[in-house]
Amino acid sequence: MNTIIESLQQFLQYTGFANMTWQHIVMICIGIAFITVAIKKDWEPLLLVPIGFGMVIGNIPFTEGLQIGIYEQGSVMNILYQGVQKGWYPPLIFLGIGAMTDFSSLISQPRLLLIGAAAQIGIFGAYIAAIHMGFTPAESGAIGIIGGADGPTAIFLSSKLAPHLMGAIAVSAYSYMALVPVIQRPIMLMMTTKNERLIRMKTPRQVSQKEKIIFPIVGFILTALIVPSGMPLLGMLFFGNLLKESGVTKRLAETARGPMIDVVTILIGVTVGCSTQANVFLTGTSVKIFFLGLFSFVIATVCGVGFAKIMNLFCKEGNKINPLIGNAGVSAVPDAARVSQNVGRECDPNNHLLMHAMAPNVAGVIGSAVAAGIILSFLG
């Protein structure tokens, strides 16, 4: 009888219940909240469902030495996590993004590239704020990139500069990507007048197939020469776009923007979620990172809208820019552009801003990768 009781006690010591703490419960609840919001609100479900479930997986307590934890060498999750730690996954995501992206709006309206560039100021604003809050320059650079609203770029840069903060930075970046409509809309309304919101922009010109093919080649050469350290992201982005636009690599483009990006998104989401273990994630540092991420995102939106208003001072009547597209300078494609469209139609149901907003939006994708390269070249 004693042997049976001892065996039961020994078994119970191996269960998750015996090792459960309130921190584990909090993190599991946060993971479930991510899943709930993704399903009920339809906020970035392709990102939040894997991340949320990964949080649940990563916070089930277990006895050390079982070779199942994400930080235990040789475990399945640890092997999958190598793609995040060593920066393999983000370039593959950029390959898929490139194969999905139509740069026509940017090619036909190159001046809107400046709005995408202006929005990157949020990254450097958060960098300065993080320095003042006690983070090292490398940590501050990794945190600042959250303002680009680009999860893969945030993972890529944090894996190089601050791997110990990668979980908090990645979750913060993806959370704010999901909250784009909630965060940006009030800022856009506060910064624009009714007359500005009613501005109708000229229909962009048609872009030839030749221009679409030349753009990724020239774009990559120029950006890579300026910021060689951003080549892994920029190269895959423009290569993916060339696959899409060349007309002779349809199968490769479909694979890049379909099955491949879906698989990599799942792997990134689950492994990043798993990495947010209670003892690592529930700290004052994580709270600071979330605050700085929000600050960076707000500054990026303000700079994008504000710069569009400044550009209007130099634009002739009839060629004005609707400043509502300024929010789209962040890299959240196409969510930020949809916010521009929705807010614009609230004021004028017949004013379609989506095609215009896509120009600074795709410029923001390029801009965030360039900004990451600049930060990496100085701090890496």
What are these regions (language model features)?
Residues 164-182, 290-302, 324-328:
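Alpha-helical transmembrane segments
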